[in-house]
């Protein structure tokens, strides 16, 4: 908390149009004295009149990895916007405000703390995620770089857990979202549904033990992408692919793969591999081509061999949406919402 506040006061507040800063993400669920999970960073949201003045960044301060994300002050103009947007409602309800020169964040905190768990707003946030998934459109096909097919599939599967986590009043933006949704489903009497969600990502016949060799390829492409330079310097997620973040991006994923619920590692393997390939696509297409067989091998291990398989996974996700809705209603009913 102190390092994040020092960062907000010492650096971010110097930028024009600064309106405040607060903590977000999984750190808000920790009790006093709890250690931050290995591989996690501390999310610091910086509010500006124009968020374009400050770039999204990751940097180490006092042994903590801070992820700084700018947001527009307009997002906090009224309680309704905050309460219907999960990542705003969760953070404002918890109210870990670092700096609030205008008093706006404190006001939104008081409103969110009172209303964010009401049935109306739980359902509105749940419905927002379901709408996002149902309107995701046709995923890019073979005329785009392979990583551009991987990203919407992997993130779509991850977001499929969000309506359920939202209904249970849990944070969605957690590193181990499939583990989190498994705990919720177990608690609310629907344990069998977890396998339906994870299958969107892993397929039905994946072999967790066989993922280890793909971790070696992920490590290699990460190191190669870290060493590249060129147009990717201006890409938003380039700050995620740096030598200083090796343990966060690769080491933490390897530890999850070796845990009792390795499905969460698959999401991060795909997301990180795709980001590394985007860096190489921008900077060094020869290196990108050299790692393409490794990405194809990882996809094949998950049952993805071409465009038809991506399309089938999207259809599988769309078909599951009514059941996700039904599960969330069951959870809300049990919670008296």
Give, region by region, the residue ranges found by the protein language model:
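Conserved nucleotidyltransferase catalytic core and NTase-mimicking acidic/glycine-rich helix/loop elements
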Residues: 122-337
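Metal-dependent nucleotidyltransferase catalytic core
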Residues: 1-19, 26-96
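Noncatalytic linker/hinge segments flanking ATPase motor cores
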Residues: 60-67, 84-91, 107-113, 198-207
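Short N-terminal helix-initiation segments at or just after the protein's N-terminus
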Residues: 6-11, 95-106, 212-217
């Amino acid at each position: 908390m102190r390092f994040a506040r020092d960062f907000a006061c010492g650096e971010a507040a110097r930028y024009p149009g600064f309106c405040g800063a607060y903590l977000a993400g999984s750190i808000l669920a920790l009790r006093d004295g709890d250690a931050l999970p290995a591989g996690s960073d501390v999310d610091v949201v910086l509010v500006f009149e124009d968020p374009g003045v400050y770039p999204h960044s990751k940097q180490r301060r006092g042994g903590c990895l801070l992820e700084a994300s700018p947001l527009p002050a307009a997002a906090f103009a009224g309680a309704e916007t905050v309460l219907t947007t999960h990542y705003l409602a969760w953070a404002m309800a918890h109210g870990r405000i670092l700096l609030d020169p205008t008093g706006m964040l404190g006001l939104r905190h008081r409103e969110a703390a009172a209303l964010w768990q009401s049935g109306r707003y739980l359902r509105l946030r749940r419905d927002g995620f379901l709408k996002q998934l149902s309107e995701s459109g046709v995923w890019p096909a073979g005329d785009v770089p392979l990583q551009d097919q991987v990203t919407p599939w992997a993130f779509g599967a991850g977001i499929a857990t969000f309506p359920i986590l939202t209904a249970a009043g849990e944070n969605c933006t957690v590193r181990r979202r499939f583990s989190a949704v498994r705990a919720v489903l177990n608690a609310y009497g629907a344990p069998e549904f977890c396998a339906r969600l994870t299958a969107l990502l892993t397929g039905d016949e994946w072999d967790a033990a066989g993922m280890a060799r793909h971790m070696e390829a992920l490590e290699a492409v990460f190191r190669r992408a870290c060493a590249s330079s060129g147009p990717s310097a201006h890409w938003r997620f380039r700050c995620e692919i740096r030598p200083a973040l090796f343990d966060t991006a690769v080491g933490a994923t390897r530890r999850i793969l070796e845990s009792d619920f390795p499905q969460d590692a698959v999401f991060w393997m795909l997301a990180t591999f795709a980001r590394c390939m985007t860096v190489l696509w921008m900077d060094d297409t020869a290196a990108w081509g050299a790692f393409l067989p490794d990405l194809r091998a990882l996809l094949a291990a998950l049952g993805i061999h071409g465009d038809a398989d991506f399309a089938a996974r999207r259809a599988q996700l769309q078909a599951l949406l009514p059941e996700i809705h039904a599960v969330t209603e069951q959870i809300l009913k049990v919670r008296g919402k």
